[in-house]
């Protein structure tokens, strides 16, 4: 350790010995898992929170357009399945006509979403959201009716065991008995019943397909409603963002006060 000497007013004064300087260097290396999580967070921020607002608005518009087209297609498929159900035996599902009114409301909701994407605005957004909400409600009602049809009306073909039987006349004659014996081999009961079983399975498959379409309508309506609400919230917050950006630009362009001016003003006040 060295001792320094300081001369004050011609008098030598000894200062305290200087202490040795210690430099602590800490090297910290992050683990690979931490770096991977940071990279995933950066990717998520890039995908879901892009820096530019124009691509985000365009992406929301494409999502609305795709969801609207999907809703229209699901509504058309629902109406087609409703026609197939009406051609089958009587059921509560076919008598309610839920395939037609649920499909029509979903088609209207899809058309509203497309119109809102082409002509954005608050009024169009509110109308599109209301139509989408109505489509969601009707799709849920159709799902409930379809599930009840599967639970409570499991066998719509009540006459399947007797439809393949030939009816006998009240007073059979001798000629009829002879005809029946000769044509009995031509009438194939087993084949008739096999066809009826195929028809039963086909009708059950149509009902199951209609249930799947209704579930898809519920999901698509929920997603479309979420996208529409997000678009409305983005439109309402856009003026606030523009005002904040203008304030930031004005703050950056303002000239900061110089220290000389501050000192001059202070001297004048004193």
UniProtKB/Swiss-Prot annotation:
Organ and tissue specificity: Expressed in lung and dermal fibroblasts.
Any single GO BP term: dendritic cell differentiation
Compartment(s) where it occurs, according to its Swiss-Prot or TrEMBL record: Nucleus membrane
Entry membrane topology: Multi-pass membrane protein
Top-rank lineage group of the source organism: Eukaryota
One of the record's GO cellular component terms: nuclear membrane
Induction note: Up-regulated in fibrotic lung. Down-regulated in activated dendritic cells.
Keywords: Differentiation, Membrane, Nucleus, Phosphoprotein, Transmembrane, Transmembrane helix
Residues passing through the membrane, by range: 65-85, 95-115, 127-147, 209-229
One Pfam family hit: CD20
Modified residues (Phosphoserine): 236, 245, 254, 258
Chain intervals with Polar residues compositional bias: 260-270
Sequence segments annotated as region (Disordered): 237-270
Family as reported in the entry's similarity comment: Belongs to the TMEM176 family.
Free-text function comment from the UniProt entry: May play a role in the process of maturation of dendritic cells. Required for the development of cerebellar granule cells.
UniProt-listed PANTHER family: LR8/HCA112, TRANSMEMBRANE PROTEIN 176B
Name used for this protein in its record: Transmembrane protein 176B
Gene name of the record: TMEM176B
